[in-house]
Design a protein with these regions (language model features):
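Sequence context surrounding c-type heme c attachment/ligation sites in exported
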Residues: 1-19, 257-402
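Generic structural hydrophobic/aromatic packing signal, biased to beta-strands
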Residues: 196, 209, 241-243, 265-268, ...
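Sparse, context-dependent recognition of short Cys/His-centered cofactor- or disulfide-binding micro-motifs
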Residues: 226, 252, 330-333
C-alpha cells in the first residue's frame, strides 16, 4: 500500500516513455502542474488515501526510518496542494475541490506517521555513515579534481569549516533563514546550513567574515559586482563553500523537529577568480541504499536531473517531446530537459568569487556570524510556522474529512 501510494503521487512518465520520480529529494511538481488533480490519477490517489485511512496503513510498517521518509514525502505533496496562490489563479479555479479532497486525507495520514521525539533522535546520521564507508577522501586532490571528497571535519565546531548565519545571528523574524532561497524552495521541510573554509584555518575564515561585514555598503543592482570587483574581498583560491540540507519531520505532538538525515551536501572549491574555474561536488541521499544501512552517494559529473529547484515554469514533464527538445537545445544544444549540478548552481550563483554566495548579500552589511546549527534550525521552524500551509496542516491533521 505504501509503495502504491508513493508511486501514484510521485512517479511521472513523459510521452516518450521516460520515467521520473523513483528516488528524488523533491516531487516533480511545478505551480502549473495538474497531474494530481485530473483523472484518472486523481481518482486513483483518492482511492488509495481512503484505503490507507480505513485500513490504518500507518501500522503496516513500524521501521522509524521508513516512516520518516514517507511522512516527509506526503508533507511535500500537502504543501503543494495548500499553495494559497494556486486557488486564486483563474485557470486553476476548477481544481479547488480536488485540492481540498487530497489535503483533507493527506493531513491525518501525515500525523499518523509521526515519530516520537525519542525515535527521531535515533534516526541515523547519514553524513557519519557516509564517512564511515571510506568511499570518499576527506580532502580534494588537486591532481584529480574530478573526484568528489567529503570533509570529515565539516561539522567540527572548532575545525576549519565555519558554519555561519547572516543577520548578526538574530532569531527569526529579526533575521531570515540564511539560505533563504533554498529554504523557500524546500517549503521549510528542510534546514540548510552554509559553511565556509578559507586556506589558513578557522581564524582566517573568521577574519574574512569580519572584512565582509565591515565592507562599505553599495547601492543599486550592481552592488554585489562592485563589492567583489573592488579587490577588497576576493575569496582566495582554494576557498571552499558548502551547503548542507537536513530533513525536518513533524513529531507525534505536531511539532517540527530536525533530524540527522542529511539529504544533500553541495561543495564548491574556488580556483582563481572566475566561477567557471570552480569545482563543484554534490552528495545526495538515496532511500533504498539508506534503508540498507548506507549513507550519501556522490553525484557523478555527467549525471543529469530535471531542473526543479527555483524554477517557476510550466510542468516540463507534460510538454511534448519535440517541445522539450527545442527548449533544451536552446540551452545546452541537446535533447532532454535535464541539467547537471554545475549548471544548476551557476544559474543562480552567477557572479564570481565572494559575490556568488547569495547568503552574504541578503542584507548590507550582512552581519555574518559564526554559529552553532541549532539557531539556524530555529529560524527555519519559526519561518515555516508563519506559513499558511503549516497552519492548514495543523487544522486538518486531527480527523479525516471527506
Amino acid at each position: 500500500l505504501w509503495n502504491r501510494l508513493y508511486a501514484a503521487l510521485y512517479m511521472r512518465t513523459t510521452d516518450d516513455g521516460q520515467s521520473y520520480g523513483q528516488d528524488d529529494l523533491d516531487p516533480f511538481l511545478w505551480p502549473s502542474s495538474t497531474y494530481l488533480l485530473t483523472e484518472p490519477r486523481h481518482g486513483q490517489i483518492l482511492a488509495l488515501l481512503n484505503e490507507f485511512l480505513d485500513k490504518r496503513g500507518d501500522n503496516l510498517i513500524a521501521q522509524p526510518l521508513k516512516r520518516a521518509f514517507f511522512q516527509n514525502d506526503l508533507w511535500a505533496i500537502f504543501d503543494w496542494l495548500a499553495d494559497p496562490d494556486a486557488e486564486h489563479v483563474e485557470k486553476k479555479a476548477r481544481f479547488i475541490a480536488e485540492r481540498q479532497a487530497l489535503r483533507n486525507r493527506l493531513a491525518p495520514i501525515i500525523r499518523r506517521l509521526a515519530l516520537s521525539n525519542e525515535q527521531i533522535e535515533t534516526l541515523p546520521d547519514t553524513y557519519r555513515v557516509a564517512l564511515a564507508s571510506g568511499a570518499y577522501p576527506a580532502r580534494q586532490n588537486p591532481a584529480h579534481t574530478e573526484k568528489a571528497f567529503l570533509p570529515r571535519d565539516l561539522f567540527d565546531g572548532h575545525g576549519p569549516w565555519v558554519h555561519f548565519q547572516n543577520g548578526d545571528g538574530k532569531p527569526h523574524p529579526f533575521a531570515k533563514p540564511t539560505a533563504l532561497t533554498h529554504v523557500h524552495f524546500a517549503g521549510g521541510r528542510s534546514t540548510f546550513f552554509v559553511f565556509m573554509n578559507l586556506p589558513g584555518g578557522r581564524q582566517t575564515t573568521l577574519d574574512y567574515m569580519q572584512k565582509v561585514n565591515a565592507f562599505p555598503a553599495t547601492s543599486g543592482p550592481q552592488g554585489r559586482l562592485l563589492t567583489s570587483s573592488s579587490g577588497a574581498l576576493p575569496a582566495p583560491s582554494g576557498t571552499q563553500f558548502a551547503i548542507v540540507r537536513q530533513m525536518m519531520l513533524i513529531d507525534d505532538k505536531g511539532k517540527m523537529r530536525p533530524t540527522r538525515l542529511i539529504e544533500s551536501v553541495q561543495i564548491r572549491v574556488v580556483r582563481g577568480n572566475m566561477e567557471k574555474e570552480s569545482d563543484f561536488y554534490e552528495f545526495t541521499q538515496h532511500r533504498k541504499e539508506l534503508f540498507d544501512g548506507k549513507g550519501l552517494r556522490a553525484v557523478k559529473s555527467d549525471e543529469v536531473t530535471i531542473p526543479v529547484f527555483n524554477v517557476r515554469d510550466e510542468d516540463v514533464l507534460d510538454l511534448p517531446r519535440s517541445v522539450r527538445q527545442k527548449r533544451e537545445a536552446a540551452v545546452k544544444g541537446e535533447g532532454r530537459v535535464t541539467e547537471n549540478l554545475r549548471i544548476g548552481c551557476t544559474s543562480c550563483h552567477t557572479q564570481s568569487g565572494i559575490a556568488s554566495v547569495s547568503s552574504f548579500f541578503h542584507d548590507r552589511p550582512p552581519g555574518l556570524t559564526a554559529s552553532e546549527r541549532g539557531p539556524e534550525v530555529e529560524r527555519v521552524i519559526r519561518w515555516k510556522g508563519e506559513k499558511f500551509n503549516w497552519g492548514l496542516l495543523q487544522g486538518l491533521a486531527t480527523e479525516p474529512r471527506h
